[in-house]
Design a protein with these regions (language model features):
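Noncatalytic, solvent-exposed loop/strand surfaces
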Residues: 15-415
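Bacterial N-terminal signal peptides
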Residues: 1-10
Length: 415
């Protein structure tokens, strides 16, 4: 079996950066560090700053800068904004990019996609379909609007797919009930490098995908792995051409099977949550041509995540369900190693978890934050803290600190 490794989006990434939504290797795994474990909503909170509007994006970190997107103001009067802070919580700059398209979901916003950086430029995407590049002083280098260029985007809910970097391009995924596509723009100029149509016939709402592509490397080739519309597809990152595809996720063509959680990829295996959190499947992320459910390595019913993206590490997959159930399954077989239902709360677990060593950080929409120790035999809750806030973004663990973006505030927690 050819082994795939998640491609670092920037050559020479420094260990203590968090350049995109799911971290240094885009897999939800933090670099080794002495991260906070025991704390409260007040103790060890080094600082917190009030957000100027709604946003569900995860902060990114590059050197001494913390950057995130947010609405500036509310509803139709608000604007798409990019905010930059230092490690003392001081706002260094704020750049507005035009009128926002407000969120529809109670926890949604016009600023759900996270920033991605190559260390020189910041790339952003909003529900308004504005895509832009900025420098680290907040200057807009280029800006475009995908709806103006390619037609209306008809998501039922709120745009959730974050941009990713592949080679010299930044890639955006637009998967909805209209004409769907992948778009690669040159990082420097913003000009179109390629555009690849991605359309499938689906029942109501099923064509809509809020997942983020993954960039993986295999045999000297960089592949974009894309999940949505009942298909997992692999595309040549240089051209957008489809290399392989998997169908078979929805053989009875059920409606409303939109996809939110992104796949996890480890050791050449893609782990895909589907069926509104009721199914999980593993398949090889290599090859060519069209494959079906018969080509899955495994498929499990009753295990899955609707919104939170799983983590695959060291032959194990950690899955956080909608109500807080945590599963650990074998990467190669899908067999359940353990299941835990101790994480409780009044809200849904929309936030994707973060793994640091053997510590799993999990939070929910009603402000519950759990730090758990995971092992081959199970999970142990080390800390449960309740914040007066709402969490849908991913906990960021970097430089021995945790950044936590809530609806109300951005928190920095450390020892």
């Amino acid at each position: 079996m050819t082994v795939l490794a998640l491609v670092l989006t920037t050559m020479g990434l420094q260990a203590q950066n968090w350049p995109e939504w799911r971290g240094p290797a885009a897999n939800g795994i933090a670099e080794q560090g002495n991260y906070p474990v025991v704390f409260s909503a007040t103790d060890d909170v080094l600082w917190k700053v009030k957000m100027p509007g709604k946003g569900g994006s995860t902060p990114i970190v590059w050197k001494d800068r913390i950057v995130l997107t947010s609405g500036v103001g509310e509803d139709t009067d608000g604007e798409d904004g990019v905010l930059c802070y230092n490690w003392e919580g001081k706002l260094l700059w704020q750049t507005k990019l035009g009128n926002q398209l407000p969120g529809k979901h109670r926890r949604g916003s016009g600023s759900n996609p996270s920033v991605v950086t190559n260390g020189e430029r910041l790339f952003v995407f909003f529900k308004s379909s504005t895509a832009a590049a900025l420098d680290f002083e907040g200057k807009i280098l280029w800006k475009t609007n995908l709806m103006e260029e390619y037609g209306e985007i008809s998501y039922f809910w709120d745009l959730g797919s974050s941009p990713v970097l592949a080679g010299n391009n930044v890639v955006f995924a637009v998967m909805h009930e209209g004409a769907s596509y992948l778009l690669a723009l040159d990082q420097v100029t913003g000009k179109v490098a390629w555009k690849a149509d991605r359309n499938y016939e689906c029942k109501a709402e099923t064509a809509q995908s809020y997942s983020t592509p993954l960039v993986v490397g295999e045999g000297g080739r960089t592949t974009l792995v894309v999940w949505g519309a009942d298909h997992l597809t692999g595309h040549n990152a240089e051209t957008g051409k489809m290399i392989w595809s998997y169908s078979g996720f929805n053989p009875t063509q059920r409606p409303y099977w939109r996809t939110i959680a992104s796949p996890a990829v480890s050791e050449g295996i893609a782990v895909v949550p589907f069926g509104r959190g009721m199914h999980l499947a593993g398949m090889k992320c290599i090859g060519s041509g069209n494959m079906t459910g018969e080509d899955f390595l495994w498929e499990k019913k009753g295990i899955g995540a609707d919104v939170a993206t799983p983590i695959a590490s060291n032959g194990k997959v950690y899955v956080v369900g909608h109500t807080g159930t945590v599963w650990c399954v074998d990467l190669y077989t899908g067999n359940e190693l353990w299941k835990n239902e101790e994480l409780v709360g009044n809200g849904a677990f929309f936030s994707s978890p973060t793994l640091a060593g053997n510590k799993l950080y999990v939070c929910n929409e009603e402000g519950d934050l759990y730090v758990c120790e995971v092992s081959t035999s199970g999970i142990k809750i080390l800390n449960h803290t309740k914040f007066d806030d709402n969490f849908v973004s991913t906990p960021v663990l970097v430089r021995d600190r945790m950044l936590l973006r809530g609806t109300k505030n951005l928190y920095c927690i450390g020892n």
